[in-house]
Amino acid sequence: MLWLAVACVVVSSIGITPTSAPSTETGGDVTATAVLPLPSVTPTSTPMPTASVLPTVVPTSTPTPIPDPALLADQVYVYPQPLIAGDQVTFDVVPVLPQGNYEDVKVTITLPSGEMLTGQVNQQGFDQQQRVRFYWAWDTRGLSGSQIVTLTLDLPAEVVDPNPTNNRLSLPITLQSAERLAPPGPGVRWQSTEAAGVRLHYLTGSAAERDLPEIMEAASEASAAVRARLQSRQSQALNIYLLDRVLGQGGYAASDWVAISYVDRAYAPADLEMLLKHELTHHLDGGLGCDDAPTLLREGLAVMVAGGHYWPASLPRKAAVLPGTEAYIPLSTLVEDFYQHQHEIAYLEAGALLVYLEEAIGLQGVESLCRVASSDERSDRDRLSAALVESGLGDLVEVEQDWLRWLGALHPTSLETEALDLEIRYLETMRAYQRQYDRVANFRKGILFSPAAAMQAEITADFVRDPDASEAIALELLLRLAQEKLRRQDLTRASALLNDVRGALEYSPPWDGMAQDVLEVVKASLARGYEPYRVLDKPAQGGWLIYALDRADWPAQRQLWAAPDERGRWIVTGPQ
C-alpha cells in the first residue's frame, strides 16, 4: 500500500475450535518525498455487550496512570537498514502520548546541517498508531561516520506533561561505508521494459533481472487472464514494480501501479501468478465501479479472481472451516475496519463471500453491487447492506445467513481444519519474525514505500536491503521450509518447524535443535561466500541440501551440501 525494534512474541494457534454459533446480527503534512497513500481505515467503536438483567456490584478500579508524553530512542525507527552514507533516510517516530486524538501534536527533527523538519502526529499505518513519518527526509550524501539527529516533541497547551525534559531526544546515528553492503551492493539502479499489457520496472542485480523473460511471460498471461475474467476494456499498460526484498505480504498496489516482491529469500507465501492476478484486479476493479466500494468487496474480488489468497485453493471449502469457531468474523464486523481483523481470516471470508455472490447474481450483479455500495457516505456496513438489498438478495444479515447455509453444505474434513489453523499460525509466526528482525517489512508496523516515487527520485535501498544477520537468514530458511511442508500437507513437520522458529524468537543463540543446526549451516555458507535462500533436510543422507546465491557472481544460484563432521561441526561443500 511495509529493523531496529526488538519484540519477543510467541505465537500460538489461532484457535479454530468449535464454539457457539456465530451471530449474524451483529496523516499530517511532512516536508519530504511523496509516498504511497495507504487505504483509509476509519476507527469505529466496538458495541459493548448487553448489560446483565440483575444489577452487579462493580469494585472501584484503580485509575490507569496517564502516560508522560515523551520521545524514546527505541520508538524512533530509521530506514533503510543497514544505514549507508549517501542514503535518503526515512524516520518513523512513535511518541508516547496520553489516549486521545490531538490535532496539534508535532515532532521536529533537526538534522546535523541544522535543517529542521516538522511533521504532525496522526494515526498512520495499518496498526493505526499515533506517529509521524518523515519519508526520505535526510539526504546523507557527502556525510559519513557518527551523526547526531535531534528530535523535539511539541505539545498543545491542554496536554498534561509532568516531565517536559523527555520531550527532546538526541539520537546518534552511524553512517556506514558502502563496503559494508552485501551484494547487490550500492550500484543498484531502476530499469524498465514492456510486455503485453504491462510495464515492468526492476532493479539491476536482482532476481527479477535474472529471471526477466519468465516474469514477462507470467505478467502478460496474468494481465490477459484478469482482463478477460473482469471483462475489462481498459487498454492502458499497468506499471509493475518488482522489489528485491519482502515487503508486507509480498505485494501491494496503488491506483496506477503494483509492487510485487520477487526474491530468492522467499519466506513469505508469495506465488508470482497469484500476486499478479490479485494486484491486477485491484488495478482494474475501478472499471467495475469497485474503487470506492467497501474494502471487503474489493479484497474479496481480488482473492476470488486470483483463485486463492497465497496459493490456489477452493475458497468456499477453506472458509467452510470457520463458522462455529472462535476464529469466524461476522460479516457485519468484518466489513468495518477490514484491515484491523486477523489478516488471513478476513481475506478468506471476503473471497468466499464473493464466490457466493457471483454464483448468486453473476459478475454483472457484482459490478452493480460495487457501484451501489460506493454511492454515499454512510458506514461500510450500511452501504453494503443497502446494496445487497437492491441486488435482490436481502440485507447483510439475511445474506450472511444464506451464505453460512451454503458453506455448511460443504462439510470440510478435520485435515482441512488442521491445515487452515496451521496456515494461519505460519503467517502469524512470520509476522513475529518481521517484528523482531525486519520491522519495515511487517505490514502493520512497517512502511510500504512507493516504488513509483522512489524510481523518480532514483532511490533503491528501501527495496533491496533485507536483514543480513545470520540469525535472520536462518529463521527465514526455517519459515520457508515450514511453508513447503504445509503446502505438501506434511502438517506434523510444518508444526514442528514453526515451534523451532517460535522458540528461537524467544531466546538468543545458541538455539535448540534444528534452529541451531540451520544457523550453523548459514554461518558456514556465508564464510564461503554463499548466501542461503532455501534448505532441504535430507535425513537419509545425513545432511542438508542448500540453495544459495553466489556473492562473487551475484545473483547466480548454486547448490551446496552441508553435513556434520566427527565433532558435530557443520561442514559446507560444493557447489555441486
Residue ranges and their predicted role:
Residues M274-G287, E299-V303, L354, G362:
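Active-site recognition of the HExxH zinc-binding catalytic motif
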Residues G187-P294, H309-P312, A319-V321, T325-Y328, ...:
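Juxtacatalytic substrate-recognition/specificity segment
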